[in-house]
Amino acid sequence: MEDKKTALLITYYWPPAGGAGVHRWLRLSNYFIENGWKLHVYCPENAEWPIIDNELQKQVTSDLTIIRKSIFEPHKYLGKKNNPNVSGGLTRNSKSSIIQKLIIWTRGNLFIPDARVFWIRPSFRFLKKYLNEHPEITTIISTGPPHSLHVIGQKLKKERPKIKWVADFRDPWTDIDFYQELLPGKWADKRQHNLEKKCLQEADEIVTISDNCAEGLSKIGQRKVEVITNGYNFPYFDEEKIDLDSKFTIAHFGSMSFPRNPEILWNVLSDICKENSSFKNDLLVNLIGPVDFTIFERLIIHQLERNYKYIALVTHQESIQMQRASQIMLLVANRTGNVKGILTGKFFEYLGAKRPILAIGEADSDLETAMNLTQCGKFISYDDYSTTRTEILKWYDLFQENKLECNSINLDMYSSQSLAKKYCALLDSLL
């Protein structure tokens, strides 16, 4: 049986790609070999990733077999090359123009399931031959988004019915919170739902990252969905002690799109600044990553223009160091529909930094559950001014006394090593 424990991972995000999409499988893959699984990783060679982070290539273990194939990316012809603000199509540089709306409509109606649709056919042909040359591969794992990769998996499964196929959903498909922003017409919407249902019903196993997300996928596919959350790697954080920021820093890492605007926080910070000159002098909001232009407008309206710092892009290693030095980590869930099941990789990375997390989102969500389980900070509903103010003032008092700490618990269950063991056990059950 041992010589049969080889899997093929089909992924779009792989180093030197940076950003949120790469970390789930980069981390899990590190521990597959110790659980008895060899992994072949199929990824694009010349992709138009919105973020490049060459440092991540150092985290790729030598026991992986990496296969790269060129990909046609329509984004390069739409003026989006290497612009981190188009990640997910949610953050904007300025007010939407007719051209921008046309680009979004094109994406939502012509590129189905997504802009990587042109990689499906050549990948299927290439991997069909590759599987013939590597009969030891018994299992395929497709991870999306982009969900075009699930279509590749579905085609390979149809071609080789005996092979096992696991569809790994890092985000929902048609239930993703920005789906309607893509302006899908009736034909496109029907096509998306048909593809989604087909993949969900034909895969041997469906895996996703949270309970609410699993519930949504289960309803669509009419089947059980396994939950294996994102996680983090302990070694990246178990380094020498880092000096904390001298300012009372509230740091947000990653994309802050318009639906993630933490308006209640700006209200609270603005009011306290007006009442307390010491607080105003100490406060610094660090925004690291793509930020929608409306966020800056709101900061100015709340007279916080001198209390924030914007850094467009840092490497993953730099972000880890900055997280560990921050006084407070800010995590905001999109204020849109279907957000209860979104438990992002950012949350787990914040856990590893072991600094207090201020999470703003929807009540009874998977994020609130995880916050309560780990006791890593404070979860606050979107419009809860009183609790937000109380927590900020409490943390500021502790900051002034050099006693602001995070005493989180139950972290082992979210380590990439533990999650990889769980994933490999699932793969074992398919053999």
Task: Identify the meaning behind each predicted range.
Residues N212, G231:
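Carbohydrate-associated surface elements
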Residues M1-H75, E205, V225, I272, ...:
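N-terminal subdomain of nucleotide-sugar transferases
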Residues R125, S148-V151, K155-E159, W173-T174, ...:
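Membrane-proximal helix-turn-helix segments that form the acceptor-binding/catalytic region
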Residues D243-R260, W266-S270, L419:
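Conserved donor-binding/catalytic core segment of Leloir-type glycosyltransferases
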Residues D282, L287-G289, T294-I320:
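Nucleotide-activated donor-binding/catalytic signature segment of Leloir-type glycosyltransferases, i.e.
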Residues R260, T315-M322, M329-F348, P356-T369, ...:
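Nucleotide-sugar-dependent
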Residues H75-K80, Y232-K247:
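Acidic anion/phosphate-binding donor-loop and adjacent secondary structure
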Residues P44-R121, Y130:
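A conserved catalytic-core segment of Leloir-type glycosyltransferases
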